[in-house]
């Protein structure tokens, strides 16, 4: 059902906070996972059970501390302990879908609330804009509704080239693209939830222009995506390109921690398997003439690529987390896109679509061997 959240004095944030309170008051959800804004304007994800805290909810803030799929997987496990609503961006929803396929989360007792995403800033830039008074949420939403500046260099690179900015699938979708937010916030609500909330269908003025704005945003970002991919492929194709890109890796494993798909409770690279004896280093250095330090960094990233590339949603959180400013996310996005194309798979597209590596088709990959008669 299509509806409209009324706004107070053109305040979209107040309108969406009222919706969240309504969801809790009507017992559609018992708890809500949503970004909260502290008194110092810091955005932090939180699981809210007391509606009082929803006065701080800000799902529109252009900041992304974590990919929320990680938190949702922790909150729900295989069986959510309560009816929980989760407010997520598109890349977070898509990551969650693949985590569900990997049996790390469940849709049981989960209400998915998706928000159109005009893009987010790196933390340092977001904090600077907040501190200097250069970030107006109203202006940000207005630009998003018109589809303007959504490939701006000020945004995170992952957002500049994101060509899937609309949250799907979701039980409730909050529309920004193409919306006249002075009228209210257009929403799409699953019929059962709409009935509980006693919402009435509303014909939204200008709704026909939404798809045009979405198409324009995707076209802008596809241009950035093609340019960035071409530059990264050139670096990867160069002699020792992969090793050169990761040459400054300090083996902190931040990228692993930030990745929503990297879910192993005990990572091989955090075990004693890679705690080498001192003799190992001198022996290896003598054999090769020189040994890269810290050791095993390339093996770490190659292993993650092998595990993650099919489900990489290009959220870019690994790049954000890297203290050495290595473009980890760009490497994974480029290689992930090639792997996903080879298997005709797109992460998060369809929950019923199985992960390629857990399926078998007798007639696939015939080019790597002779077809049996």
Task: Briefly describe each language-model feature range.
Residues 89-94, 154-167, 247-268, 309-325:
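Local cysteine-cluster metal-coordination motifs and their immediate loop/turn environment
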